[in-house]
């Protein structure tokens, strides 16, 4: 994957349950190859977000948010509490071992041990994409997390599933990219689908997203499909040659 140019991989525990929870070994392998490990979790998750960081994921993804409170709880769940003002959703404290086998036994050491992590919010419901007022409020919450600490990612399938084929979805997505870019927030989307398989169409979709400010672009096939798709690609010349020869 890394040699093909991929830079981040999402492990989807929202829809694949335990198979989608990557452990220390899988995350370490990706980290050594320069791949950002993004752990997507089920919408009910709270404690699991902090646990994912301890297992080596460097980013976590919150799907299907519909309210400002959903986003607020997510960012609480990936951060340790502020001294004197904890909430029920903050990460809990426990001794954590560093890669060099040293331990972090104090709150100061614990906070200092983990700085290069991100929280990704998925903008994939009509509440987050179509409702501009709520969207902008969440973007401001993301800004408050600090530079490069929060990213936004669009999966438009859920909007269409919930609302139907509404014409304003694509413009709402592009407007989201533009507004987030003004605030210094990195955003992205899946480009391609079962009804959009032509590489030329996918390329045009990626160009449109990039021009509107998106920087985190994802292909639509699952990584588990890459071997099959690669095999099809390698076998294709044989079948074209056979057809030309009358077989």
Language model feature labels by segment:
Residues 2-26, 62, 152-171, 221:
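Glycine-rich, proline-tolerant flexible connector loops at the mouths of alpha/beta enzymes
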Residues 15-17, 43-45, 64-66, 123-127, ...:
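Active-site-proximal loop/turn and secondary-structure-junction residues that shape catalytic pockets
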Residues 190-247:
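C-terminal active-site rim and adjoining tail of enzyme catalytic domains
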Residues 58, 62-148, 153-161, 246-247:
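Conserved anion-binding
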Residues 3, 44-58, 62, 69-74, ...:
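Catalytic cores of alpha/beta
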Residues 9-11, 37-41, 59-62, 119-123, ...:
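Hydrophobic faces of well-ordered beta-strands that scaffold small-molecule active sites
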Residues 18-51, 77-88, 92, 98-100, ...:
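Alpha-helix-loop-beta-strand connector modules within alpha/beta enzyme cores
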Residues 66, 133, 165-172, 201:
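Alpha-helix N-cap and loop-to-helix initiation/capping positions
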